[in-house]
From Swiss-Prot:
The keyword DNA repair applies. GO terms for cellular component: mismatch repair complex. Pfam families: DNA_mis_repair (PF01119), HATPase_c_3 (PF13589), MutL_C (PF08676). Gene3D superfamilies: 3.30.230.10, Histidine kinase-like ATPase, C-terminal domain (3.30.565.10), MutL, C-terminal domain, dimerisation subdomain (3.30.1540.20), MutL, C-terminal domain, regulatory subdomain (3.30.1370.100). The keyword Lyase does not apply. This is DNA mismatch repair protein MutL. One of its GO terms (molecular function) is ATP binding. This protein is involved in the repair of mismatches in DNA. It is required for dam-dependent methyl-directed DNA mismatch repair. May act as a 'molecular matchmaker', a protein that promotes the formation of a stable complex between two or more DNA-binding proteins in an ATP-dependent manner without itself being part of a final effector complex. PANTHER family: DNA MISMATCH REPAIR PROTEIN MLH, PMS, MUTL, DNA MISMATCH REPAIR PROTEIN MLH1. Belongs to the DNA mismatch repair MutL/HexB family. Keywords: DNA damage, DNA repair. GO terms for biological process: mismatch repair. The gene is mutL.
Length: 611
């Protein structure tokens, strides 16, 4: 007796449906994709019990014709592709022809649609079988009503979460579609109550309405870049804002939400010099790429994508973010977001509609812009005045530490640490401050313009050395005896191989001498005596951006050379660190950690009830 047999057609469809439809939010995603692909400018969403009981979508798209309606629920029927060539240039959100058939198998679905606006037809399908096809009163667009979800998938239904959790998952899907399609009006109804309306608006305004309350001072920076077949639009929080989780890093490729580790790494890598380890930036990335250079057909829910040239894209994103925060702020427009919402969950906040708002013309109203653009000028030398607050100054006593003293001398006598000040700095200009003293052998206390600064001595010295290293003139130093090293991790080996030519631009010459084996032949003069540090960088390489390696290398050298906690500093050297701190306008150490804490005279008076 044969053990291998053909599966029943209905069973095959149930298995296929289980792969793409795992919970109500999956159904919602597929239906929204269809509405968006239909060219709809208005989409109404009705959810009951987190989508478990009912999902109803109404759109004003081009609709489905009578004959197409009869077959639209069958497996692998689609209007979006017709040949293998079409797979290479997909521009629609859906394309496989699986969505409606999978939904029809695991629920009861009713579709009413019209292409003319004069007459419409309705088809009702239960368990993948047509039950009714009839003429209906005229509508403009399509209505899809899904009920009894997973009634014939008892195991799947048993593992659904409680209503609030399923609702939250559906709202996340809605958020993804709302943010990527600002040209569409969305109306959201939960359990037969109107919850939120998003009007047609610009992408900037849509980001405001969806994410505007994420950062306290409501300021986003907008970075736009174009390169051949790639268009980048980034919404970045100011450098002093970060989160403990990655959930506020969101990436969208051709209007699809993508969970791609490489894109996440590119964004975090670009922020690595301003955000401390363990924290993550607030960033929303929108990529538009020629469809011929990407492949979305790699994940059942299209959450991943293959890029034609991922290393280049990684570098483009990372370097542009890095350069963005390096440049003067007056080179960019700062978008000021006015906080409108007070509820943590924007999507479920009740909307306060004007009394005269007519439901029939809601979508003809375009919301007033709530963004204003400010051009902020980075004035590096204003308000530098000395004030005496009467605190007792004391002179720090340097202990008898010859090796430490010698280290300080070497740092600032080496020629490669000399660098020119930026042209807009006045070298003769004296930075006025009142040095109070050193506390806990760790912090320097300074008074300047009615403010008190507590400065981390190690971090500020580390940053000063780091900046001198970055701006120094470098020369190539050939090693008398090349240093051999091994790369064990295959992924790291691939990264090193792809970047060997780039290392040459940094005056770092390495050669591959066998499988997983390399030798270091030349290094920049500033890396002298730090060859082992460089080898460690190669062996633990995770980033694809050369600038990151260079920055991390300099940060490591600076960390080794900088003064440490418990080092007692002389008065002269302390003043030097403070002068450089104000002159370079230092805010973060090379690892992204904050260098100082500041409190104003007014705040201090408030603490002691004098204000």
């Amino acid at each position: 007796m044969n053990k291998i047999r053909f599966l029943d057609k209905y069973l095959v469809q149930k298995i296929a449906a289980g792969e793409s439809i795992d919970r109500p939010c999956s159904i919602l995603r597929e239906l929204l994709d269809n509405s968006i692909d239909s060219g709809a400018t208005k989409i109404e969403v009705f959810l009951e019990e987190g989508g478990i009981h009912k999902i109803l979508i109404i759109d004003n798209g081009i609709g489905i014709g009578k004959e197409d309606l009869k077959i639209c629920y069958l497996p692998h029927t689609t209007s979006k592709i017709s040949s293998e060539e079409d797979l290479r240039k997909i521009e629609t959100l859906g394309f496989r022809g699986e969505a409606l058939s999978s939904i029809a198998i695991c629920s009861n679905i009713s579709i009413t649609s019209s292409t003319t606006g004069n007459e419409s037809y309705q088809i009702e399908v239960e368990n993948g079988i047509e039950k009714c096809f009839k003429k209906q009163p005229a509508i403009n667009g399509t209505i899809v009503n899904v009920t009894k979800i997973f009634h014939n998938f008892p195991a799947r239904k048993r593992f659904l979460k409680q209503e609030p959790i399923e609702t939250k998952m559906c709202l996340k899907v809605l958020e993804e579609k709302i943010i990527t399609h600002p040209e569409i009006n969305f109306e959201i109804n939960l359990n037969q109550k109107l919850r939120k309306i998003y009007f047609k608006e610009s992408l900037i305004d849509r980001v405001q309405n969806v994410y505007g309350n994420v950062i306290e001072n409501n300021k986003f920076k907008v970075l736009k870049k174009e390169h051949e077949n790639i268009k980048i639009e980034l919404f970045l929080a100011p450098a002093n804002f970060s989160k403990k989780s990655k959930r506020h890093i969101k990436t969208f490729v051709n209007r699809r939400p993508i969970d791609q580790k490489d894109l996440l790494e590119a964004i975090t890598n670009g922020h690595s010099r301003i955000i401390s380890p363990g924290n993550f930036p607030i960033c929303y990335l929108f990529l538009e790429i020629n469809p011929e250079y990407i492949d979305f057909n790699v994940h059942p829910q299209k959450k991943e994508v293959r890029f034609f040239n991922l290393p280049f894209l990684f570098k483009l994103i990372s370097d542009n973010i890095n350069n963005f925060f390096d440049k003067d702020i007056n080179s960019y427009n700062e978008i000021v977001i006015k906080r409108q919402l007070t509820d943590d969950d924007n999507l479920i906040e009740m909307i306060n509609q004007p009394k005269n708002l007519n439901k029939t013309n809601t979508y003809d109203i375009i919301q007033n812009k709530n963004l204003e653009t400010e051009h902020t000028v980075n004035d590096l030398s204003k308000n530098i005045i000395q004030n005496d607050i009467g605190l007792r100054r004391y002179n720090s006593i340097i202990q008898n530490r010859p090796s430490f003293k010698e280290n300080i001398t070497n740092i600032f006598s080496d020629k490669f640490l000399e660098f020119e000040e930026p042209p807009n700095k006045n070298e003769k200009e004296e930075i006025k401050f009142n040095y109070i003293g050193q506390i806990f052998s760790e912090f320097l206390i300074v008074e300047k313009v009615n403010e008190i600064y507590f400065i981390d001595q190690h971090a500020v010295h580390e940053k000063i050395i780091y900046e001198k290293l970055r701006n120094s003139k470098k020369t190539v130093q050939k090693l008398l005896i090349p240093i051999e090293f091994t790369i064990v991790d295959k992924n790291i080996e691939e990264i090193i191989d792809s970047e060997i030519e780039e290392y040459k631009k940094m005056d770092i010459i390495i050669s591959k001498i066998g499988p997983k084996k390399y030798q270091l032949e030349s290094i920049p003069n500033i890396c002298n005596q730090y060859e082992n540090t460089l080898i460690n960088f190669f062996q633990s390489r995770k980033s694809r951006t050369i600038n990151s390696l260079e920055s991390d290398l300099y940060a490591n050298i600076a960390c080794r050379k900088a003064v440490k906690t418990n080092d007692i500093l002389s008065l002269e050297f302390s003043k030097f660190l403070i002068d450089e701190f104000f002159k370079l306008e230092i805010k973060h150490c090379p690892h992204g950690r904050k260098i100082y804490y500041k409190i104003s005279k007014f705040e201090l008076e408030k603490k002691v009830a004098r204000a």
